[in-house]
Amino acid sequence: MKIFSCIKPVVDPTTRFSINESKTWIKTQDATFTASEADNYALEEALRLREKHTGEVVAVSLGGEEAAKVLRAGLAMGADRAIHLSDARARPASEFSVAETLARAIERDGGTDLVLTGVQSDDLGTGATGVMLAEFLGWAHATVAIGLSLDPESKTAVVERELEGGLLEKVEVQLPAVITVQYGANQPRYASLKGIMAAKKKPFMVWTAQEVGI
């Protein structure tokens, strides 16, 4: 079972920051970055599925050094390898372009059985990237997952979704698929000292936008 876990770097909410001169975003030069919270839940879910079904977890992120930082943290948590999409064109503002870049990277890596993302990012909060990613890949998708089980033989996933008003829904999707994971779906593990040391020896690939065909 091969699982991609998408991780977005966001400004640490405890960081003091200011608006840039053009008043379009914050000044990121001195900001501290961390993984978007929901993406940590997605990574934890990926690690649990790997532990149950064997296989590998591939962490992927777009951006500069801030992306490399969250990928190293993901490796320390337990991901098997990381793909850093590092290029000016691999840091677009639109979710559409982000989803396209992620899709091309997954294809370049030979595809996968499952892609997990957080339900939304802590900064923009649109919740659109995962759905767009599924569309680019031509795969089924399920959103706002709070529970997930896989059947490798039938290549299906049963997803428990949290709907508005506290309602729950169970759906079955055919693999490969993209699933977005809700806040609080599990308890993300802390990176151990052993995990931090092991992360330094794990494969860490750096690809440009041109290399993934963007």
Identify the meaning behind each predicted range.
Residues 1-214:
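N-terminal glycine-rich FAD/FM-binding segment characteristic of electron-transfer flavoproteins
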